[in-house]
Swiss-Prot record:
It comes from Daucus carota. Part of the 30S ribosomal subunit. Contacts protein S5. The interaction surface between S4 and S5 is involved in control of translational fidelity. HAMAP family: Ribosomal_uS4_B. The keyword Chloroplast applies. GO terms for biological process: ribosomal small subunit biogenesis; translation. One of the primary rRNA binding proteins, it binds directly to 16S rRNA where it nucleates assembly of the body of the 30S subunit. The gene is rps4. NCBIfam families: PRK05327.1 (NF003717), rpsD_bact (TIGR01017). This is Small ribosomal subunit protein uS4c.
Amino acid sequence: MSRYRGPRFKKIRRLGALPGLTNKRPRAGSDLRNQSRSGKKSQYRIRLEEKQKLRFHYGLTERQLLKYVRIAGKAKGSTGQVLLQLLEMRLDNILFRLGMATTIPGARQLVNHRHILVNGRIVDIPSYRCKPRDIITARDEQNSRALIQNSFNSPSQDEMPKHLTLQPFQYKGLVNQIIDSKWVGLKINELLVVEYYSRQT
């Protein structure tokens, strides 16, 4: 299944706020209206919607998300927590959380078009897994810095998570540590996502 490129507002009206996909927010009460129209949700649908939230927020294909779930399942610790850490430490998401892009699709474009350096080297793979002590900068070119400055000039998003530090005048971000789960930028029940996939196999 390919990455979603359809109307974004339609998704947030059904699933709630997805800051990685769009900075728009559903109107107050729209969740309640949707629920009353559709009646009581089945457990399957609840798990499916949590999975879809994760997929659309981080801009993943179904295959990519399944791959991350499998990697998380083999790691030590809670599968759900590890899954969120893997997704949050992607380069495209780190750029978004730093405010260097207003959405994750926007961050992905910066990476694909070779505007971003990690530790002084161009990285053009959005799924690159960032590590503690990584230094993320814009290329020293007017076009690259102008794109990021536009994001800095946009209305600010949520508070900067503790695992990141931004130095905006240098167009630089630092990864201080692996993210703590309480700083994940999405309201999600990750256990339902893991349950969804465990019931598919």
